[in-house]
UniProtKB/Swiss-Prot annotation:
Listed InterPro entries: Aro_prenylTrfase, Aro_prenylTrfase_DMATS, DMATS-type_fun
Keyword set, alphabetical order: Transferase
UniProt-annotated binding residues for L-tryptophan: V107, V108, E111
Pathway this chain belongs to: Secondary metabolite biosynthesis; Alkaloid biosynthesis; Mycotoxin biosynthesis
NCBIfam families per the UniProt record, alphabetical: arom_pren_DMATS
Catalytic activity: quinolinone B + dimethylallyl diphosphate = peniprequinolone + diphosphate
UniProt source species: Penicillium thymicola
Name of the featured protein: Prenyltransferase penI
C-alpha cells in the first residue's frame, strides 16, 4: 500500500500527525457526527474524488472505517495506509439499480467486522464489499462476478501475495458457462432473479492487508440455495481432506447435521496450501443441545487441554443475551423467533422483500462455518448468533457484548467499541438504532481461547 504515495511519505505524515505539526480541526462528518480522525482528515485532503458514486461511498463509510481503526488502536501510519487503500478500492459504479444484494443493507453494499482482542492480540478491523460494475446484471455479467474480480486485479499491485487460483477453480465448477441462459431464465420468470454471487473481503492486519472471496453457487434451473451434492465435486477436486470427511459423516449421521443447509463458501486469496476453506451452513435450531452437537461434531471433537463444555456454555450465554432469551432456558429449548415488524424491515421494497423471504430460514436460527481446507484432521468451527433487531436495539446489543467481554476478563477495548458505535449511530443515538449489528460470531480456538467477532452494517 505504501507504493501509492511512497512508504517514506506515509512515515513522515504519521510523524506529523502524531506531533501535531498539522493544524487539525475537527469537523462533522455527515451522518457520523464524531470528529474526523486525524488520518482521515489527511487522506481526504490528499485524495480527490473520482466521481459522485466514489464520493458517496467515501463520505458515508470512510469516517466509520477511520473510527474503527482509531478505536481499535491501530498505529497512525497503518491507519493512513488502510484509508489510502480503501480510497483506491471503493467501487465507482452505481449500485442503486434494481438489484438483489447479498448483503442486508440499503445504504451501500458493505459490511464491517470488528474482531475482538485476545490475550495476545489487539482488535482487527475488516470489511466486505459487494462490488458493482457497468456490466453487472447484463448479459456480459449476469451474476455480478466481473466487478469483484476486477477489484482484486486492481489491488494486486499493492498486495503482491494475492492469488486467484481458487477463484478460478470455483467459478469454473460452481457456475454454468452460458451467461445468456441466466438472463433468459430471469427474464422468463422460470428461474431465480439475478443477484450477486461473489463478495470480496479485506482483512486489515497490523502490518499487512489480506483478501478473501465469498461465493454463493448458482446453477441454471436452481431454485433457492444450492444443495450439498452440488458443492462436492468442486471441493473434492482440491484433494483429500480429513476435515471434509469428518464433516460429511456428521452431516449424514447426526440428527442436527442433517438439518444443516449449505449457503456458501469462502477462501483466502493466497497460495492454496496456505488458504482456509470455509463452508457455511444454516441451522433452524437455537437450543444449547443443538449448539453443543454442532460445535463438537457430535462428540467427534474433544479437547484434552480445556473443558469444551464450559466454553460452549459461555458462548451460549452470549447468544441468549443477544437474542433476548431467559438465562434459565432449558438446554433442549430453542430461542423462539418472532415475526419482524414491517417498520424494521424493507417489506415495502419489492426487491428487498424477495431477499427477506430467501433469508428467512437463515436468520431464524444459528449459522456456522466449517474450515475444511486440506491438511487438517478436524475442521475449525465458527458459530454465528443473529441479531434480532425487532427485539433489541444496538445499545442493548453493545451492552450484551461488552458485559460478556468484561466477564471474560477482556474489557480493555469495550469503551472504544461503544464510542465507535455511537459515531456510527450519529444523532439518532444507539438506543434508537436497530440494525447496526448483524451477527456476533464465536470460534473456540485450539488453545481454548474464544475468538469473537462483531459484524456491523453502515449506519
Amino acid at each position: 500500500m505504501a507504493s501509492l504515495i511512497g512508504g517514506s511519505a506515509i512515515q513522515h505524515l504519521a510523524q506529523d500527525i502524531d506531533t501535531n505539526k498539522i493544524n487539525h480541526k475537527a469537523k462533522a462528518n455527515g451522518p457520523n457526527l464524531a470528529p474526523k480522525s486525524r488520518a482521515l482528515d489527511m487522506v481526504s485532503k490528499l485524495e480527490p474524488s473520482r466521481g459522485p458514486v466514489h464520493e458517496h461511498w467515501w463520505d458515508l463509510t470512510s469516517p466509520q472505517l477511520a473510527s474503527m481503526l482509531e478505536e481499535a488502536g491501530y498505529p497512525v501510519g497503518r491507519q493512513l495506509e488502510i484509508l489510502l487503500f480503501y480510497n483506491h478500492t471503493i467501487p465507482e459504479a452505481d449500485s442503486s439499480r434494481n438489484w438483489q444484494s447479498l448483503l442486508p443493507v440499503t445504504v451501500v453494499p458493505l459490511e464491517y467486522s470488528w474482531k475482538w482482542d485476545t490475550a495476545c492480540e489487539s482488535p482487527e478491523v475488516r470489511l466486505t464489499i459487494e462490488a458493482f460494475g457497468d456490466l453487472s446484471g447484463t448479459r456480459a455479467d449476469p451474476l455480478n462476478q466481473a466487478a469483484a474480480i476486477e477489484l482484486l486485479h486492481r489491488t494486486k499491485g499493492v498486495l503482491p501475495d494475492l492469488n486467484q487460483t481458487w477463484i478460478n477453480h470455483f467459478c469454473s465448477t460452481l457456475f454454468d458457462e452460458d451467461k445468456d441462459k441466466y438472463m433468459e431464465e430471469a427474464q422468463s420468470g422460470t428461474g431465480m432473479r439475478l443477484q450477486s454471487t461473489m463478495l470480496v473481503a479485506f482483512e486489515f492486519g497490523r502490518t499487512s492487508t489480506s483478501t478473501k472471496t465469498y461465493l454463493t453457487p448458482r446453477r441454471l434451473g436452481q431454485q433457492g440455495f444450492a444443495r450439498l451434492p452440488e458443492y462436492m465435486p468442486a471441493i473434492q477436486a482440491l484433494g483429500p481432506s480429513r476435515a471434509l470427511d469428518t464433516l460429511m459423516d456428521f452431516l449424514h449421521t447426526s440428527p442436527e447435521g442433517v438439518e444443516l443447509t449449505p449457503f456458501g463458501l469462502s477462501f483466502d486469496n493466497v497460495e492454496p496450501t496456505s488458504s482456509r476453506l470455509k463452508f457455511y451452513f444454516a441451522s433452524p435450531n437455537t437450543s444449547y443441545n443443538s449448539l453443543r452437537e454442532v460445535l463438537t461434531l457430535g462428540c467427534r471433537i474433544s479437547k484434552a487441554n480445556f473443558n469444551i463444555e464450559e466454553k460452549i456454555r459461555t458462548i451460549h450465554s452470549l447468544a441468549k443475551a443477544l437474542m433476548v432469551a431467559p438465562d434459565n432456558l432449558p438446554d433442549d429449548e430453542h430461542i423462539s423467533a418472532r415475526a419482524q415488524p414491517q417498520s424494521l424491515s424493507s417489506a415495502s421494497d419489492p426487491v428487498t422483500s424477495d431477499i427477506v423471504k430467501e433469508r428467512t430460514s437463515l436468520l431464524a436460527g444459528y449459522q456456522y462455518y466449517f474450515d475444511i481446507a486440506p491438511g487438517a484432521d478436524l475442521p475449525d468451527i465458527r458459530f454465528y448468533a443473529p441479531i434480532r433487531k425487532e427485539l433489541i436495539n444496538d445499545r442493548g446489543v453493545a451492552a450484551a457484548v461488552t458485559d460478556w467481554m468484561k466477564a471474560q476478563g477482556r474489557g480493555k477495548f469495550c469503551d472504544n467499541y461503544v464510542r465507535m458505535l455511537e459515531g456510527m449511530a450519529g444523532e439518532r443515538g444507539l438506543s434508537k438504532c436497530h440494525g447496526l449489528h448483524s451477527f456476533i460470531g464465536c470460534l473456540i480456538r485450539r488453545d481454548g481461547e474464544l475468538d469473537v467477532t462483531s459484524y456491523l452494517l453502515p449506519g
